[in-house]
C-alpha cells in the first residue's frame, strides 16, 4: 500500500533521506546492511537476483508507469510517494525514472566460491569512483568475463550510482571482495595463483606485451587486473603478475580511463 509523504521527518524515510551509503552498508552489522536501488530496470534486476525489498519510494507520475509491474508483485512492501520536487528535496538528488527501492544486502560469497569453474575474471584494485565501477561491471557482464573481484579500497558496486551506471549488471555477474583478513596484494595474488589463474596487469610499461599477444590470449585461466586512474596499479602488483599488458593507441594518446580500458581488455581477453 502506498502512503503519501506528509512528514519528511518520518523515521521510515530515514534510509532515503538521512542515512549515508556507508551507514546503510553497516545498518545491521555484523549482518549485511541495506542499499538503495534506483530506476525500475535496476530494481527489477536486483529482485530477479534474489534481493529483498524493504520499501519503495516512487514519484507520483510513475505509479502508473514503469514501476507499476514491479509494485504489483510486492503489494505488502511499504511504499511512499510524492511529486518530483518533493522527492528531490527529500533525497537531495534527482531521481532517475522516478523510483527508488531500499533493499537488504545478501551475504557475499568467498573468492574461492566466485572463482569455481570460471576461466576469466576481472580484478579491480582501489577503483574508488562509483561511475567507473558501474561502467566496468557493465562491460565485464557484456564482454565475456565470468566474475569480478575487488580489493577493499574499491567503491561498493551496490552504491546507488554504481548500480545505476551499471544498468543493474552488478546483479548479473558474480562478484565479491577479497577477505579483509587477506593482505593485498601479497595474499590476494597468492590466492589467484593457488586457484590456477595467470595474472595480467593492465599497465603502460616498456616491457608490456600487446593485448593481442597469442600466449596471453591462449591462457586457460586469466585474471585481468586494473587499477585506479592516475596512480595506476602498484609496482609490486605489476612485478608479481605473469603479464604486463598494454593497449596500442594512436594520435599520441598515452592512456585511456580505467572504464574504457576495461572494455577493450574484456573484449580482447574475455572468454568467447
Where are these regions (language model features)?
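Boundary-proximal intrinsically disordered activation/regulatory segments immediately upstream
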Residues: 1-66, 154-155
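Structured adenosyl-cofactor binding patch, chiefly the S-adenosyl-L-methionine
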Residues: 99-101, 139-143, 157-171, 235-272
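Active-site/ligand-binding-proximal alpha/beta "capping" segment
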Residues: 200-252
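RNA substrate-binding interface of SAM-dependent RNA methyltransferases
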Residues: 107-207
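Short, aromatic/basic amphipathic alpha-helical patches
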Residues: 65-76, 237
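Glycine- and other small-residue-rich loops at beta-strand/loop junctions that grip anionic moieties
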Residues: 5, 35, 125-126, 151-152, ...
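Short acidic-hydrophobic, aromatic-tinged amphipathic segments that line or gate anion-handling sites
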Residues: 2-9, 78-83, 174-184, 245
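Glycine/small-residue-rich loop that forms an oxyanion/phosphate-binding "nest" at active or ligand-binding sites
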Residues: 71, 76-96
